[in-house]
UniProtKB/Swiss-Prot annotation:
Superkingdom of the source species: Bacteria
Protein name: Holliday junction branch migration complex subunit RuvB
HAMAP family referenced in this protein's UniProt entry, alphabetically: DNA_HJ_migration_RuvB
SMART domains reported in the protein's UniProt record: AAA
Binding site for DNA: 311, 316
Gene: ruvB
Lineage: Bacteria, Bacillati, Bacillota, Bacilli, Bacillales
Major localisation: cytoplasm
Chain residues that bind Mg(2+): 67
Function comment: The RuvA-RuvB-RuvC complex processes Holliday junction (HJ) DNA during genetic recombination and DNA repair, while the RuvA-RuvB complex plays an important role in the rescue of blocked DNA replication forks via replication fork reversal (RFR). RuvA specifically binds to HJ cruciform DNA, conferring on it an open structure. The RuvB hexamer acts as an ATP-dependent pump, pulling dsDNA into and through the RuvAB complex. RuvB forms 2 homohexamers on either side of HJ DNA bound by 1 or 2 RuvA tetramers; 4 subunits per hexamer contact DNA at a time.
Enzyme Commission number(s) from the entry: 3.6.4.-
Subunit structure: Homohexamer. Forms an RuvA(8)-RuvB(12)-Holliday junction (HJ) complex. HJ DNA is sandwiched between 2 RuvA tetramers; dsDNA enters through RuvA and exits via RuvB. An RuvB hexamer assembles on each DNA strand where it exits the tetramer. Each RuvB hexamer is contacted by two RuvA subunits (via domain III) on 2 adjacent RuvB subunits; this complex drives branch migration. In the full resolvosome a probable DNA-RuvA(4)-RuvB(12)-RuvC(2) complex forms which resolves the HJ.
Residue ranges of the region described as Small ATPAse domain (RuvB-S): 183-253
Amino acid sequence: MEERLVSGEVLGEETALEPSLRPQYLHEYIGQDKIKENLKVFIEAAKLREETLDHVLLYGPPGLGKTTLAVIIANEMGVKLRATSGPALERPGDLAALLTSLEPGDVLFIDEIHRLPRAVEEVLYPAMEDYCLDITIGKGPDARTLRLDLPPFTLVGATTRAGALSAPLRDRFGVISRLEYYHVDQLAQIIERAAAILQIGIEREAALELARRARGTPRIANRLLRRVRDFAQVRGEGGITLPLAVEALERLQVDRLGLDQIDHKLLSAMIEKFAGGPVGLETLAAVIGEEAQTIEEVYEPYLMQIGLLQRTPRGRVVTPAAYTHLGMEVPKR
């Protein structure tokens, strides 16, 4: 799958750049107001009691700020953050080494926690519940279990697929929060903040235009800002104006709803080859040359969210709004 400008996932170039745009404390964090207010209370209460914060599970679509909140939690608690990911912890020993290196109060952040192997996940249970680590020494009838005490710590888990978490793991989190897509005005504020950090001027209307095409996702908003900044700087203009933003986004092939070429290809194929549907997932995948899982997990969610596509028992169906958006006549059914 090619890298998409409107993908919520981290693209290669962004690994080093994202931290520079990331807010460090709750008062700098824009959006997710309910989560933010609750975390403020939980953090203040933990500090008053001189205890570690309860384990936190953050879930929601990619690019909404789960990693940023983990950084903020550590900063607000005044402790170190140790970050890893589910796929990186292949064996129980990998997690054991990480847990035994923690200092009291540390925040351990595990991204994509739903991808932890079951054997590794089981090591987490006593670590989360009793701050201890059970190590098996030897094999067979002579095997014995050695229990090691761990310093108190806070686990922050992040996932895009909360339903894929096992019940025993999910139940051990004291704080569970779902991150929602952002409103346009919130994204515009995020864009203006990032523009100030990147030292590029941007008109309010231009920030709003970028926000409208960012699919409710801060990561996409910041990515669009950086690409439009390229156009502004190459042209020698002092900042990003609305006309420049619109022209740049059109050249980047991101339309006014945030759809790109692949979205248009999917919708057009359904309309032109299947009269708008219903069409089966496997058939659609074969026609547009993409894997069925990629269509279901990457492309469809946003199209359904904005009302251009529906899943029905008989298959996928394009809505009248999709015809209108693509400039096609809505068929009479």
